Every structure is written in C-alpha cells, then in structure tokens.
Amino acid sequence: MPQYVHTNNSSFAIPYNGSWAHLSYFLSAGHTTRKWVRDGGFDILHLHEPETPSLSHKPLVMHDAPPMVATFHASIEPYPRALRLFTRYLRKYLSPLREAIFVSESAQKTAEHYLPQQVGIQTIPNGIECDFYRRAEPNPQWRGNPEAPTIGFLGRMGEERKGFTVFAQAAKIVHEAFPSARFLVAGDGQEDGEKTLDAIGADKGLRERFEFLGRVSDADKARFYRSLSMYVAPQTGGESFGIVLAEAMAAGCPVIASDLDAFRAVTEEGSSAALFVNRDANDCARRMTELIEDPARRQSLSQAGSIRSRSFDWNTVVDEVLEVYAKALS
C-alpha cells in the first residue's frame, strides 16, 4: 500500500443501482476522516460521490474544512421516487461544495436532482493512461487470428447490468456460423457465468470455446485488450461513462457496445465503435459477425477508437481538473 494511501476501518455493502455500493458510516470512521482532513493541512479537498452516506460525506459537516470539489459518477434513470425524499437533505449537506465535476452528461442529469444551484459545474470524463494500454504486449495464448478470432468480455458476471447474458446469447449465435471463434471472459463470477451458459442451453462445443480468466491484474487487463480481435461491452444500464470502452480503444481493440447514452457519448455516437440495440443479443451477434467478416472494418474501428481515446488521457484530463481547482480556490 503506498504511503499516501490512508485506509479507514471496514465497510459494508448494500445493493444499489444494479450493483453493490460499499459504505463506511461508522462513528469511528467519521472521527478518523475528520482528523485526517485537519491534520493534512490540505489546500483543497476533492471528494467522490459525497451524496452517499460514506467517507466522502464526512467533511461536508466540518466547519474548518478546506475548499471542496466533488466528482459525481452515478447515473440512475429513471431517478427513483424514494430518493426524491432526500433531496432537501442532500441540497443542504452538499451546499459547502464550491465546484462539481460530472464524468458525463448522464451523471449530471442524476446529480441535478440534489445539487445546490450555487455550486459551479463542469463535465470532465474519467481519465486513463493511454500509453499504458497502447504499449501492452499481446498474450499469445489470448491472441486471435483470422481463423480463430477472440471476442472478449470484461466484468462481473453475477451483475445483470454488466450484460454477460446478452454476451453469452450472442456468442451462441456466432458460434453456429464461426465454430472456431473463442470467447475470453475476464472478471469475477465464473460460477455465475457457467450458470448463464446452462440457462441459454450452451452445448459442449460452445462451452469449449469459452475461457474464463478470472479477475485479472491491470497489466493483464491491458494485454487482454491488446490480444482480442474485438471487445464487447454489453452493459444493460446503470453506466455513467464506460471506462472499459476507453481502455479498449486506447489499446487499439475494435469495440462493440450497447447503445446506452453513456456509451454513445464515449464513442461519439458510434463513430469509434460498433453499437447495437441494448439487450438485443441478435443485434450484438450481427455486429460480431460483421467484424469477423470484415478485417478492414476492424482496422477502421481500431484507428478511430485509438484517436478517440486520447480525449480521456490523463495528460488532457488533469489540466481540466486543475482549472476546476483554481475556480474553487478563487
């Protein structure tokens, strides 16, 4: 653990927005966080998701906290009626913020329900290290070729919104026409993935073409993208940005993605990726088939994605964040 990282007690998980949110709202956590802020002597404090009852919520009630900026990531559509009950509370407790950053327009639409009007706003995407992905060496065991293309999925298979069921259904269709295609799956939940293959009636031939890699390191994730013939992002909702798309594009991997608003924004309405109708496995399979059959199209998407990913490079994003800090300090 780097010396600049300070941990704060344990957390507990609750279901939230189709996933799990890990919160830390113990009394001791509040005391430790406030002490850390006071002892740090910071010029500015950058919070993430301060609307959640967790660590980033604590400094908002401090009378001696430094100027605060917050980044909002969540995208919830439609906005739940139950959360509207907390609007007045959140506007009061978020009032100490000077500036707010949204990772996308969809994140802004969600936060506008409770963000005080006097807070300055700016949309700045999540940042990635493009060179880290571009320079990664492909893994020969994962690398596809014209006779046996490799099609990748990365995500938690046990979360419906990550779209593994859509991916598996599309793979079943593609396997019938291209039995040599391989489907590489990285992420937690192999048991859930196996159950999904059972549910869609996958035969032995299809199962043999699936390879579950488990959770991968950052280095192996970059090699994963670099090794694929194409990467599929079949998420069904709850996404405010789509950082996996940006990472894959930075690696030069052709991307196929569901047409969520967030993914449309990242790919500039599909100019740097092949979009398919959300939750439609047949349309996803159609896109896979098109790219398998058209190497020139794959190369075109690879180049377009690589160019687009530069918009998310930290060398660009950090300057935008520093401008927000300057506003907060002025």
For each of these PLM feature ranges, what is it?
Residues 158-173, 282:
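A conserved mid-protein helix/loop that constitutes part of the nucleotide-sugar donor-binding site
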Residues 83-100, 113-114:
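Membrane-proximal helix-turn-helix segments that form the acceptor-binding/catalytic region
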Residues 195-216:
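Nucleotide-activated donor-binding/catalytic signature segment of Leloir-type glycosyltransferases, i.e.
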Residues 283, 297-311:
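A short, well-ordered alpha-helix in the C-terminal region of glycosyltransferases
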